[in-house]
């Protein structure tokens, strides 16, 4: 593709993204190259500023000033004050096309849900709550269970899902993300046999997870002395798990 064709394509892309029509008069190869770079930067900056998924990702990580949230949400046609639930999904390997397609079918854009990629192995789903029944703990838990079972059955992939409480404002999204992230970490560590982790049912695992490492090491030394075993036998492991399950 010659530079003139590339320039025309860049102008067309910019018009599709922004609705702005431009004409560029470049006579030399150097001018064309510079114009191409500027157009690509402009398209990229516009996508970043006006892309819904990028906006939600930034909200989840507290990367947008609070005073700017309502204005950005209005420009993107996202209701800032609407009850929603955040689900956090993590796979054992990577989120391939099969899993992405399953999630797309379970939570289509027309439903008002947003599928937000996070890492190669994880994504978030911001799901609207249409009624009081939809926000009940039982319904939310069943939805998380449905995600796990469907992905497991159709993509033959093991996934874990955590979920937040109902958030009523986009400003609460970062808190919900921290809740679900913690639930996933604590769940994997202390309740490895489970695949669904509610934000508010982490038991004693939440408390232990937040203890300083040095305090945990001191406790182990008190129990085992200087020689802390690298692995526990099956009976001891079963006993520890039973204690955790009963918050003892």
Model-derived segments and spans:
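Charged, amphipathic alpha-helical oligomerization/scaffolding segments
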Residues: 6, 13, 31-34, 179
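Generic hydrophobic, helix-prone segments enriched in Leu/Val/Ile
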Residues: 14, 56-57, 190
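Short, charged amphipathic alpha-helical surface segments
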Residues: 21, 25-58
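Cytosolic nucleotide-utilizing catalytic cores of signal-transduction proteins
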Residues: 6, 66-86, 90-95, 102-248
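Non-catalytic regulatory/interaction regions at protein termini and inter-domain linkers
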Residues: 1-26
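Gly/Thr-rich phosphate-binding loop signature of adenosyl cofactor/nucleotide-binding cores
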Residues: 61-62
């Amino acid at each position: 593709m010659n530079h003139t064709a590339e320039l025309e394509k860049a102008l067309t892309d910019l018009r599709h993204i922004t609705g702005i029509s431009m004409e560029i008069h470049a006579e030399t190869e150097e001018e064309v190259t510079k114009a191409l770079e500027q157009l690509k930067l402009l398209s990229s900056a516009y996508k970043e500023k006006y892309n819904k998924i990028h906006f939600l990702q930034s909200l989840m990580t507290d990367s947008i000033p609070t005073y700017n949230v309502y204005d950005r949400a209005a420009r993107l046609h996202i209701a800032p004050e609407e009850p929603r639930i955040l689900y956090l999904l993590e796979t054992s390997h990577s989120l391939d096309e099969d899993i992405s397609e399953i999630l797309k079918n379970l939570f289509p854009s027309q439903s008002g849900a947003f599928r937000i990629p996070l890492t190669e192995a994880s994504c978030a789903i911001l799901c609207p709550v249409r009624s009081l029944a939809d926000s009940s703990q039982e319904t939310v838990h069943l939805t998380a269970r449905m995600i796990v079972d469907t992905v497991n059955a159709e993509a033959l992939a093991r996934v874990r899902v955590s979920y937040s409480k109902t958030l009523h404002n986009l400003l609460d999204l970062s808190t919900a993300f921290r809740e679900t992230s913690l639930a996933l970490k604590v769940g994997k560590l202390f309740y490895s046999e489970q695949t669904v982790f509610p934000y508010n049912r982490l038991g004693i695992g939440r408390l232990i997870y937040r203890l300083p490492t040095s305090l945990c090491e001191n406790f182990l030394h008190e129990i085992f002395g200087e020689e802390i075993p690298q692995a526990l036998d099956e009976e001891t492991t079963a006993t520890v798990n039973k204690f955790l399950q009963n918050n003892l």
